[in-house]
């Protein structure tokens, strides 16, 4: 999805307590941003925030982090957090490659990857969020019981991700090849997912863990 640049977005994001600043040492201290010490779940690439804000509202016993690098859409997540009065959701405006700057080893319980950019050209494979470089980061910050939830409408990215995770030493606890046909009612739609599922697009989903987190 191409994001339209909004020159005012950067100023808008300044001085909001819901936004984790990009300065200083955060690894191991992320719980200090929340009112309560609770398990931490992250969504990488939150878009406009429908998925993560819905989760946070439904699960006040979990602390959520929305990680989105595009300032021009982060403000939409911020507005939702403020409007809904969510105290268990904070926002990081940065790239996923910087994950270990924010989280120490074993600090996270779950990672969500929803409709990530497929980067279809082979020369761009290293940018895919299921490339081995990113998997190594996830393994580092997830605790021993932690898992990864992945959802996409792109069959090629799904097949690539299954292979990439298997080669990295992960195993799958759930695989859905047509999520909306198999859904038990627990699925939370993203904005993107709603748009394309209404057009009949098949949605693929998996849950995976590392054989050895450390």
Curated annotation (Swiss-Prot):
Keywords recorded for this protein, A-Z: Methyltransferase, S-adenosyl-L-methionine, Transferase, tRNA processing
Enzyme class: transferase
GO CC terms: tRNA methyltransferase complex
GO molecular function annotation: tRNA (guanine(46)-N7)-methyltransferase activity
Ligand binding (substrate): 121, 153, 190-193
Catalyzed chemical reaction(s): guanosine(46) in tRNA + S-adenosyl-L-methionine = N(7)-methylguanosine(46) in tRNA + S-adenosyl-L-homocysteine
InterPro entries hit by this protein: SAM-dependent_MTases_sf, tRNA_(Gua-N-7)_MeTrfase_Trmb, tRNA_methyltr_TrmB_bact
Enzyme active site: 117
Documented EC number(s): 2.1.1.33
SUPFAM superfamilies: S-adenosyl-L-methionine-dependent methyltransferases (SSF53335)
Source superkingdom: Bacteria
Recorded metabolic or biological pathway in which this protein acts: tRNA modification; N(7)-methylguanine-tRNA biosynthesis
Disulfide bond entries: none
Binding residues for S-adenosyl-L-methionine: 43, 68, 95, 117
Family annotation (HAMAP family): tRNA_methyltr_TrmB
NCBIfam families linked to this entry: PRK00121.2-2, tRNA (guanosine(46)-N7)-methyltransferase TrmB
Function: Catalyzes the formation of N(7)-methylguanine at position 46 (m7G46) in tRNA.
PANTHER family given in the database record: 3-DEOXY-D-MANNO-OCTULOSONIC-ACID TRANSFERASE/TRNA GUANINE-N 7 - -METHYLTRANSFERASE (PTHR23417), PENTACOTRIPEPTIDE-REPEAT REGION OF PRORP DOMAIN-CONTAINING PROTEIN (PTHR23417:SF14)
Family from the record: Belongs to the class I-like SAM-binding methyltransferase superfamily. TrmB family.
Protein name: tRNA (guanine-N(7)-)-methyltransferase
């Amino acid at each position: 999805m191409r994001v339209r640049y909004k020159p005012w977005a950067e100023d808008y994001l300044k001085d909001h307590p819901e936004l984790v600043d990009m300065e200083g040492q955060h690894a191991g201290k992320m719980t200090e941003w929340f009112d309560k010490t609770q398990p931490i779940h992250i969504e990488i690439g939150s878009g406009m925030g429908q998925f993560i804000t819905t989760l946070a509202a439904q699960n006040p016993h979990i602390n959520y982090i929305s990680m989105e690098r595009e300032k021009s859409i982060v403000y939409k997540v911020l507005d939702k957090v403020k409007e809904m009065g969510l105290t268990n959701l904070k926002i990081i405006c940065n790239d996923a490659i910087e994950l270990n700057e924010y989280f120490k080893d074993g600090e996270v319980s779950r990672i969500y990857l929803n409709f990530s950019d497929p980067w279809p050209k082979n020369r761009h494979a290293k940018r895919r969020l299921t490339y081995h470089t990113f998997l190594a980061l996830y393994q580092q910050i997830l605790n021993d019981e932690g898992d990864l939830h992945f959802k996409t409408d792109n069959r090629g990215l799904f097949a690539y991700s299954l292979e990439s995770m298997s080669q990295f030493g992960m195993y799958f606890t759930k695989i859905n090849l047509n999520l909306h046909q198999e859904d038990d009612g627990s699925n939370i739609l993203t904005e993107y997912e709603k748009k394309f599922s209404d057009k009949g697009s098949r949605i693929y989903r998996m849950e995976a863990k590392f054989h050895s987190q450390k």
